[in-house]
UniProtKB/Swiss-Prot annotation:
Similarity field: Belongs to the CTP synthase family.
Binding site for L-glutamine: Y54, A357, F385, G386, M387, Q388, E408, R473
Misc: CTPSs have evolved a hybrid strategy for distinguishing between UTP and CTP. The overlapping regions of the product feedback inhibitory and substrate sites recognize a common feature in both compounds, the triphosphate moiety. To differentiate isosteric substrate and product pyrimidine rings, an additional pocket far from the expected kinase/ligase catalytic site, specifically recognizes the cytosine and ribose portions of the product inhibitor.
EC number of this enzyme: 6.3.4.2
UniProt-annotated catalytic positions: C384 (nucleophile), H518, E520
Gene expressing this chain: pyrG
Activity regulation, per record: Allosterically activated by GTP, when glutamine is the substrate; GTP has no effect on the reaction when ammonia is the substrate. The allosteric effector GTP functions by stabilizing the protein conformation that binds the tetrahedral intermediate(s) formed during glutamine hydrolysis. Inhibited by the product CTP, via allosteric rather than competitive inhibition.
GO biological process terms, semicolon-separated: 'de novo' CTP biosynthetic process; pyrimidine nucleobase biosynthetic process
Name of the protein described by the UniProt record: CTP synthase
NCBIfam families xrefs: PRK05380.1, PyrG
Binding of Mg(2+), residues: D71, E140
Length: 546
């Protein structure tokens, strides 16, 4: 039977529970254990699909089409285990399920309550089949202890601690140790009060993971242990790391995996960890041969968490080419307000990337960025919205279709990009009506694509058959293919039925590729996505020229 590790947070949000969970999962894997990571999100949205990126950050899409929390991206990148819709649940999903059951009469007239019905759904999710031979299931609870929204989740994991066999549950609490510079002191009171709140719910943490800017003095460690009722060795220091891929090494050095195994009584029989690959990647990130500067011209650049997987995929591409990747974040709107700014910001970059986005705001600036990259032979990578902008740019400036636009921006006589109303998933036809609901209506998840033999992308992938994850409502209009291809922008990747353009590229350019899907979602530190490795390789080549 699998053992369960519950990771909670206190004091403030955004301390890094997702990263801590992923790092612990990687450490357990390094000892030969099989792991599965899951996330409980207390918000009332059914999923983050319709949430603002500024509110939630990136929406991470799984192979089976679930729109999930960005922490699942950390889980996949650190463990290599692909997540599914069974690995993320929200209060909105739980309430939706309960109300549907109540309307069907499944509760046989009982009064539906938070306990036992809501907590029961949470426990069912936690205990649902993690897969064959899984040794540890790591459950991250979103938010912080004391949040009203989180109370049913904390109650559910408290109950599970009593219901699971003895020695099959471990509680880790991530907290903050602020350093007051004016006093020159590290303060433990916030941690003490956070643990007090957790214990008032009925949960005694086994391990405290303490985020801190400075090393924890031994006296403070003993003080925390005494007041929080844990052993001093279970007060784990979690300082900022040089890069996130050094976090597993740092946590191992502090003894996190050792303490977890000790809680389960497995320390004496646990295999020694093999952290070789983590040491290698950490070394490569710390000792690059060079540096490339990538301009990301987007819509949500004010919050880099909106592009979390994209940033990591570019870092992975840098690892593949042994270079450090620097980011120049640019709002598309900036190029609309000041055209002269384009040359100032882009002339000396080594690559231009336009990522996914929704809506018209900033689109004209992104189109101008595409044009500049094309005309000045700067490596260009367009992802989802970025591919659509490349198509519109070619249509307007090279094919003479001056009114070329997207129906996402409003009515147009030349819909180069239009709303998808039908597509195929497996053997089922998916249909979306004009003006329908937004939630859960996109073309999401893994879909096949066929690449043109001899094309650049076929060479990059080493295959003409690929499968990538998508998240979009709008698609390039295949009816414009002949006119756009006449400009040199070739459709070199299509859906298996030949109706949906998936990839475009230019042969008359050092590196110019647009893709309708999101390759960043499948990139891993130890297996960089080939498109990102190739793009950064082209940027590295340009860095030698400018």
């Amino acid at each position: 039977m699998a053992r369960y590790i519950f990771i909670t947070g206190g004091v403030v949000s955004s301390l890094g529970k997702g990263l801590a969970s992923a790092a612990l999962g990687a450490l357990l894997q390094a000892r030969g254990y099989k792991v599965r990571l899951r996330k409980l999100d207390p918000y009332l949205n059914v999923d983050p699909g319709t949430m603002s990126p500024y509110q939630h950050g990136e929406v991470f899409v799984t192979d089976d089409g679930a729109e999930t929390d960005l922490d699942l991206g950390h889980y996949e990148r650190f463990t290599g285990v692909s997540a599914t819709r069974a690995d993320n649940i929200t209060t909105g999903q739980i309430y939706k399920t309960i109300i549907e059951k109540e309307r069907r009469g499944d509760y046989l007239g009982a009064t539906v309550q938070v306990i036992p019905h809501v907590t029961g759904e949470i426990k069912d999710f936690v205990l649902s089949d993690p897969g064959p031979d899984v040794d540890f299931v790591l459950i991250e609870v979103g938010g912080t202890v004391g949040d009203i929204e989180g109370l049913p989740f904390f109650e559910a994991i408290r109950q599970l601690g009593q219901e699971l066999p003895r020695g099959h549950a471990c509680y880790i609490h991530l907290t903050l140790l602020p350093f007051i510079k004016t006093a020159g002191e590290m303060k433990t009171k916030p941690t003490q009060h956070s643990v007090k709140e957790l214990r008032s719910i009925g949960i005694q943490p086994d391990i405290l993971l303490c985020r801190t800017e400075f090393p924890i003095p031994e006296g403070e460690r003993r003080k925390i242990a005494q007041f929080c009722n844990v052993r001093p060795s279970a007060v784990i220091q979690a300082m900022d790391s040089a890069n996130i891929y050094a976090v597993p090494l740092d946590y191992h050095h502090e003894g996190l995996d050792t303490e977890v195994l000790d809680v389960f009584g497995l320390l004496d029989q646990a295999p020694k960890p093999d952290l070789t690959r983590w040491e290698e990647i950490s070394h490569r990130l710390s000792h690059p041969d060079g540096e490339v500067n990538i301009a990301i011209v987007g819509k949500y650049t004010g919050l880099t968490d909106a592009y979390k997987s994209l940033v990591e995929a570019l870092v992975h591409g840098g690892v593949a080419n042994n270079v450090r990747v620097k980011f120049d974040w640019i709002e598309g709107e900036a190029f609309e307000k000041d055209e002269d700014l384009i040359a100032v910001r882009l002339a000396n970059v080594h690559g231009v990337l336009v990522p996914g986005a929704f809506g018209e705001r900033g689109s004209e600036g992104m189109i101008r960025a595409v044009q500049f990259a094309r005309e000045h032979q700067i490596p260009y990578f367009g992802i989802c919205f970025g591919m659509q902008m490349a198509m519109i740019e070619a249509a307007r400036n090279l094919a003479g279709i001056r009114q070329a636009s997207s129906t996402e921006f409003g009515p147009t006589s030349e819909p180069i990009v239009g709303l998808m109303t039908e597509w195929t998933r497996g053997n089922e036809k998916q249909v979306r009506a004009e003006g329908g609901e937004l939630g859960g209506t996109m073309r999401c998840g893994a879909y096949d694509a066929v690449l043109a033999p001899g094309s650049r992308v076929a060479e990059i992938y080493g295959s003409t058959a690929i499968q990538e994850r998508h998240r979009h409502r709008y698609e390039v209009n295949i009816g414009y293919r002949e006119r756009i291809e006449a400009t040199g922008l070739k459709f070199t990747g299509l859906s298996p039925d030949g109706q949906l353009p998936e990839i475009c590229e230019r042969a008359d350019h050092p590196w110019f590729v647009g893709v309708q899907y999101h390759p960043e979602l499948k990139s891993r530190p130890f297996d960089p996505h080939p498109l990102f490795a190739s793009f950064i390789g082209a940027a590295k080549e340009r860095s030698r020229l400018v």
